[in-house]
């Protein structure tokens, strides 16, 4: 298997070396000069950690560690049954200022097909809930947020499927969304389940609009990340910078994915 130009054993070795070199830091990242916001994508694995414990408070603590202005969560609702939301959103709002983008028809769920988009400032102008093709119930949540009187940001929160063919079809749907909307600064945040490169990769499909693609940052599995399943991408050059995994003792156990963070300049 080839991952970002390296073999899997090489990637594992680099991950081990990098883990030894990194110092744990549970405080929010210091904002780089010129950055307008901190954004993140986090597959919370239904709030079940690597210790197999269901602990939504622990998930919320990881979000507090990150200190994001916008964060896309995946697997934040039960997948079956009543698909109830798993987080205490009222408490998260009280402690972080983050509120969910509203969705319709979700019953007891927080979001759309497990996708929850939280933001700290601005006003939601428009929301689209997109069903993505494939055997699994995957979706994308598209929100346009007026940050102030002059700036509007479009955010696409998505969780692509496990099957390569499904991912390719789903990536094309994401591009269709972009082509059907007015041109504006757009972020794609999500678990794309894609680490391979090449013509058959969903990343290659997305590259036509979300380019240049930021460097791949391994986020899975959280204990020893070797696969860059999670991505933060933008449709404008220089909009996304300093993409990093939020790697702390807490985040390593809270989910099977590490959160991915980045700075955004508009």
Q: How would you name each of these model-derived features?
A:
Residues 47-49, 78-84, 108-110, 163-165, ...:
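Active-site environment of divalent metal-dependent phosphoester hydrolases
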Residues 24-58:
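N-terminal active-site segment of His-dependent metallophosphoesterases
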Residues 2-31, 51-52, 70, 75-152, ...:
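Structured beta-strand-rich core segments of catalytic domains in phosphoester-bond hydrolases
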Residues 1-28, 123, 129, 135, ...:
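Metal-dependent phosphoester-hydrolase catalytic domains
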Residues 129-130, 156-160:
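Transmembrane beta-strand segments that form the barrel wall of outer-membrane beta-barrel proteins
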Residues 53-57, 85-86, 168, 226:
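Structural motif corresponding to alpha-helix initiation and N-cap regions
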């Amino acid at each position: 298997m080839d991952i970002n130009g390296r073999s899997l054993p090489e990637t594992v070795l680099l991950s081990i070396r990098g883990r030894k070199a990194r110092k744990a830091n549970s405080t929010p990242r210091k904002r780089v000069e010129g950055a307008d916001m901190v954004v993140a994508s986090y597959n919370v694995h239904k709030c079940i950690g690597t210790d197999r414990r269901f602990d939504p408070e622990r998930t919320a603590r990881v979000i507090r560690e990150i200190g994001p202005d916008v964060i896309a969560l995946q697997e934040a609702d039960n997948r079956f049954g009543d698909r109830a939301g798993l987080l205490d959103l009222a408490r998260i709002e009280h402690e972080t200022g983050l509120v969910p983008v509203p969705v319709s028809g979700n019953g007891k769920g927080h979001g759309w097909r497990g996708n929850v988009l939280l933001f700290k400032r601005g006003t939601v102008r428009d929301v689209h809930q997109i069903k993505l093709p494939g055997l699994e119930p995957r979706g994308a949540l598209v929100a346009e947020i007026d940050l102030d009187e002059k700036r509007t940001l479009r955010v696409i929160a998505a969780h692509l499927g496990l099957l390569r063919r499904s991912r390719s079809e789903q990536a094309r749907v994401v591009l269709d969304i972009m082509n059907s909307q007015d041109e504006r600064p757009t972020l794609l945040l999500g678990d794309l389940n894609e680490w391979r490169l090449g013509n058959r990769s969903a990343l290659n499909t997305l590259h036509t609009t979300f380019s240049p693609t930021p460097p791949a940052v391994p986020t899975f599995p959280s204990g020893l990340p070797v696969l860059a399943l999670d991505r933060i991408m933008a449709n404008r050059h220089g909009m996304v910078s300093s993409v990093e995994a939020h790697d702390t003792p807490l985040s390593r156990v809270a989910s099977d994915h590490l959160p991915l963070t980045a700075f955004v300049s508009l």
